From Swiss-Prot:
The lineage of its organism: Bacteria, Bacillati, Bacillota, Bacilli, Lactobacillales. One of its GO terms (molecular function) is rRNA (guanine-N7-)-methyltransferase activity. Belongs to the methyltransferase superfamily. RNA methyltransferase RsmG family. This is Ribosomal RNA small subunit methyltransferase G. Specifically methylates the N7 position of a guanine in 16S rRNA. The keyword rRNA processing applies. One of its GO terms (cellular component) is cytosol. It comes from Lacticaseibacillus paracasei (strain ATCC 334 / BCRC 17002 / CCUG 31169 / CIP 107868 / KCTC 3260 / NRRL B-441) (Lactobacillus paracasei). Residues 222-243 are annotated as: Disordered. Pfam families: GidB. Keywords: Cytoplasm, Methyltransferase, rRNA processing, S-adenosyl-L-methionine, Transferase. The gene is rsmG. SUPFAM superfamilies: S-adenosyl-L-methionine-dependent methyltransferases (SSF53335).
């Protein structure tokens, strides 16, 4: 997917990027590739692949939750890595208030330099473990309209890291390449325990390749009990779903 095809694919869904936004995506790609030579940010480096599998893929969130396109919303990206999906969302929808938390300082450093280069405002970056960021005494707990994670971790693990950060009546969306029935069954009780309810499993395919994607939308229907998330490392070692 070259940049022109990226712009057209978004326009087909009613998302129109102006020249400045297109320039920001181009600058993002160039800086990502130059910095990737110094640190491991992504294994995807060809321009067409980055535009499709990182940029376009990130923006599928706004196809499933169209309110992201127009409303002022607080969005927390847990484990953003090289900035996906939060930085593409911020470029396309500048009114969003973005918070990024990542456990690796060098990735936060990259994102600090990137946001400065792209002149993005209302982007807060935190070097922290998600378990600590959403702990019971954290000022960030239950403070975001939307929390998202685009990660390979199991859904029950992601739910424990992310749902404590979601406001009442807010949403958590896990962006996954696949969502197996077994994973959803294992996560269902964990999601309920954490105050969530699975509202939608939005199945999509990427243009050109047809690669499958699942956006699992979870509504926050009640407060997360104070004992969650558990201490750093425990959610991964002892998932609530029992996997």
């Amino acid at each position: 997917m070259d940049p022109a095809a990226f712009v057209q694919a978004l326009a087909d869904h009613g998302i129109v990027l102006n020249d400045h936004q297109q320039d920001q995506f181009a600058a993002y790609y160039q800086y990502l590739i130059s910095e990737n030579e110094k640190m491991n940010l992504t294994g995807i480096t060809a321009e067409g692949d980055v535009y499709l599998k990182h940029f376009y893929d990130s923006l599928t969130l706004a196809l499933v939750l169209p309110e992201l396109q127009t409303q002022v919303m607080s969005v927390c990206d847990v484990g953003a890595g090289a900035g996906f999906p939060s930085i593409p969302l911020k470029i396309a929808f500048p009114q969003l208030k973005i918070t990024i938390v990542d456990s690796l300082q060098k990735r936060i450093g990259f994102l600090e330099r990137l946001t400065a280069r792209l002149e993005l405002t209302d982007v807060q970056l935190f070097h922290d473990r998600a378990e600590a960021f959403g702990a019971k005494k954290s000022p960030h707990r239950a403070s975001f309209d939307l929390v998202t994670a685009r990660a390979v971790a199991a859904l029950d693990v992601l739910a424990e890291l992310c749902l404590p950060l979601v406001k009442p009546q807010g949403r958590f969306v896990a962006m996954k390449a696949a969502a197996t029935p077994a994973e959803l069954i294992a996560a269902k009780s964990a999601i309920g325990l954490l105050g969530g309810k699975l509202a939608q499993d939005a199945a999509l395919t990427l243009p050109e390749t047809g690669d499958p994607r699942h956006l699992l939308v979870i509504d926050k229907v009640k407060p997360t009990p104070n004992k969650y998330p558990r201490k750093p490392g425990i959610p991964n070692k002892q998932p609530l779903g029992g996997a």
